[in-house]
Amino acid sequence: KGNNRVVNIAHINDNIRNDSFKDEAFVTKVGLELGINTYIRQLNPKLKSNDESIESWARKERYKLLSEILIESNSNIILTGHHKNDQVETILKNISEKTGLFGLGGMKSVNKNLIRPLLPFTKLELMRIIDKYKIPYVDDSSNDELRFKRNFIRKKVLSPWVLNDNNIVDSIAESGANFSEYQQSLIYFINEFIQKNVSDLQNGQVLIEKKHINKLPSLAKVMVVQVLTNSLGQ
C-alpha cells in the first residue's frame, strides 16, 4: 500500500549448463547482502519432452515457477529483466517461427501481473549504468552456444547488423511496438464481434453461427479463435 513495497528476489536455475550453480550462488549472495528474501528453484531438463526445444521448455517452466513463487511470497507483481535487445531477438525469433502478426509485436511490457520495466532500454544503455555504479553481475555462459536459436540470432544476425546500422535495435523495437498497437486495435473489433455473435455453452464450449464467421477475413477468423482460447501475446 502507498509507497511501502516489499521486494523479493526469484531465480530459476535451469540446470542446462554445468556452471549454472554459479548464477544461483551469485543471486543468493546478493539477496543476503541486501537483506531481501530470495526464492531459488531448480529445473530438471530430463523432464523435457522430445518434441519440444530446450529453450521453449525452459521458458515455459520458468514462468510457471515464477507464478508459484508469486503466490508463495504473497506478492502482486513479477518483474523481469528483459531489455530492448531481448525484445528485438524475440521479434526476429518469432519471424523465423512463422508466428504471424502476434509474434511481430514481441513481448508485452505489461501482461496481467507480469511487467518488463527494462524493455525501453538497450543492453548498451544498461551496461553503461552498471559500469558507472560498479554494479556486480554475471554473464550466462550459455549465451555463446549457437545451438540455441536466440543466441544464433544475437551473434550471427543482430550483432553484424548493428555494426552496419547502429539504429537497427531501436528501429526493430519501434516496429514491434507499432505491430503491438495494430494487434490491440484488431482485438478491440474482434471482441465486439465475439460479444455480438458468440454464445457460451456448458463445459467451456462456445457456439458461433457459420454464417457469421464466414463473413470474416481469414486473419480475423484466426484471431477470434485465439482470443477465445486466450492464446494471444507472450
Tell where the protein language model's regions lie, with residue ranges:
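Internal, active-site/partner-interface "lid" segment
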Residues: 143-151, 169-180
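Short, structured loop/turn "capping" segments at alpha-beta junctions
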Residues: 136-138, 166-172, 186-188
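AMP-forming adenylation/ATP pyrophosphatase catalytic core
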Residues: 1, 8-12, 43, 47, ...
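Core alpha/beta nucleotide-donor-binding catalytic domains of modification enzymes
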Residues: 1-159
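Conserved anion/nucleotide-ligand pocket segment
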Residues: 154-172
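Solvent-exposed amphipathic alpha-helical surface segments
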Residues: 3, 34, 73, 164, ...
